A protein has these predicted regions:
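Short, structured helix-loop boundary elements
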Residues: 22-23, 43, 65, 69, ...
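Helix-turn-helix
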Residues: 24, 28, 32-66, 70
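Short secondary-structure transition hinges
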Residues: 66, 101, 107-146, 164-165
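Hydrophobic alpha-helical connector segments
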Residues: 70, 84-113, 167-170
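Short, basic, alpha-helical segments at the C-terminal edge of helix-turn-helix-like DNA-binding modules
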Residues: 73-79
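Hydrophobic/aromatic-rich alpha-helical bundle segments in the mid-to-C-terminal region
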Residues: 117-122, 130-134, 138, 152-199, ...
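Short amphipathic alpha-helical elements of helix-turn-helix/winged-helix folds
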Residues: 28-32, 70, 109, 143, ...
Length: 209
């Protein structure tokens, strides 16, 4: 069984005037949003963090909501590309193999973009920007669930656990990395990905009696 892949939601058009230090402003904003919370962070806080004036910040961005949207889109663009690439059918590959590849790529993206993914996982739909991000997250969940269903249909995975629940548990394992993973810690991304894949798929494997 092969699932029909829906098109990914289109990212919102980004606004604002480019500037040579705009990436630095965005990085500082993401760090502050994660540390203090988005609602508790003001443009004044960001200006003080960077040693700039508020007008200097507004020269490059129109609002802190624009910064939030840009950070969320950065994370979602990477995750969408990873999921789309890993789930694409190729000659000689099974849904089970593509599913494992999707989980591995998700770990790699989270590690490479940990601050923005951390921010993404904390949004609750309190604004249009956050609602758009949640819609894109749901698309990722649906793609993973569809691939789980295909792997079940192949007979590679057990069929007594709903695919949607499996997808949430898999993403839950991957997303937990934002709480404890450190790039300078004891484990590199490949080791973490191997551990998640082993623990998850050994438990999901279908064994013949």
């Amino acid at each position: 069984m092969t699932s029909t892949e829906p098109a990914a939601p289109t990212p919102r058009r980004r606004r604002g005037r480019p500037g040579y230090d705009q990436p630095a402003i965005l990085r500082a904003a993401v760090e502050l949003f994660n540390r203090k919370g988005y609602d508790a962070t003001s443009v004044g806080d960001l200006a003080r963090e960077l040693g700039l004036t508020k007008p200097a910040i507004y020269h490059h961005v129109t609002s802190k909501e624009q910064l939030l949207g840009q950070a969320l889109d950065d994370a979602l663009d990477e995750l969408t590309a990873a999921v789309t690439e890993a789930s694409r059918e190729r000659a000689g590959t099974t849904a089970y193999e593509r599913l494992r590849a999707m989980v591995r790529r998700s770990v790699e993206v989270l590690v490479a973009h940990q601050p923005s993914v951390t921010l993404l996982l904390r949004v609750r739909g309190n604004s249009e920007v956050e609602l758009a991000a949640l819609e894109r997250r749901r698309w990722l969940d649906d793609r993973l669930a569809a691939l789980v269903a295909d792997a079940v249909a192949e007979g590679a995975l057990r069929d007594d656990v709903p695919p949607k629940l499996v997808s949430r548990l898999l993403f839950g394992m991957v997303n937990s990395l934002v709480e404890w993973y450190r790039a300078d810690g004891a484990y590199d991304p490949a080791t973490v990905a191997d551990a998640i894949i082993t623990i998850a798929f050994d438990g999901l494997a279908r064994y013949e009696p």
